[in-house]
Amino acid sequence: MCVVLQDANILDVFVPRVRQTFDTREEAYLFYLDYAKLAGFSVSTKRTSKETRHWVCNREGFLKPGQENEEPMTNKTSMRIGCPAYVKVKEDKKRNIWYFHHVQEAHNHKLEPSPRMVRYMHSHKQREAALDDLFAIMSKSGVPTQTAMNVMSELFGGRQNWSFTEKDVHNK
């Protein structure tokens, strides 16, 4: 098993550390999501409770036994390879803060830190509500999706800066 640690180009202030504190659970999640984006992996929520959250690399785990024999709807292989990278965040009710209780940075797969690849990873595909509203208005006005994408591309500096695809817009 190869162990891949974070890219040496990531500044220490962006790397999660044990006992690192946050005012809210959402703030801790956004911090880890930003780190994942810089490092080149996608994040999934594994376990939750009132006081804790486990956020894992999306390549964590394996297919459940028997699933590999089922007829898939589309022909694609599983991305899950048992990656051990995760963070566990806990709430300290006395101090009214959230903190990283466990941090495992090592991955067992190659990371994809290039912005060109990261923007298509599920946890990083987030659009602003205003953009969704503009696409909805154009769609209701009968503007084809491709034309709407071209207009938005001109307005907002090109598709290379977006974290979504034409298919994402179509599916919204």
Q: What function would you assign to each model-found segment?
A:
Residues 128-142:
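Short, amphipathic alpha-helical "recognition" segments used to contact nucleic acids or chromatin
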Residues 18, 138, 159:
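Short, flexible active-site loop motifs that bind/organize anionic cofactors or intermediates
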Residues 123-126:
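Short, cationic low-complexity segments
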Residues 45-53, 61, 66, 145-172:
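Electropositive nucleic-acid engagement tracts
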Residues 1-121:
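Short, conserved DNA-binding cores of transcription-related domains
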Residues 81, 143-144:
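Short, motif-level signal for alpha-helix interfacial/capping segments enriched in acidic residues
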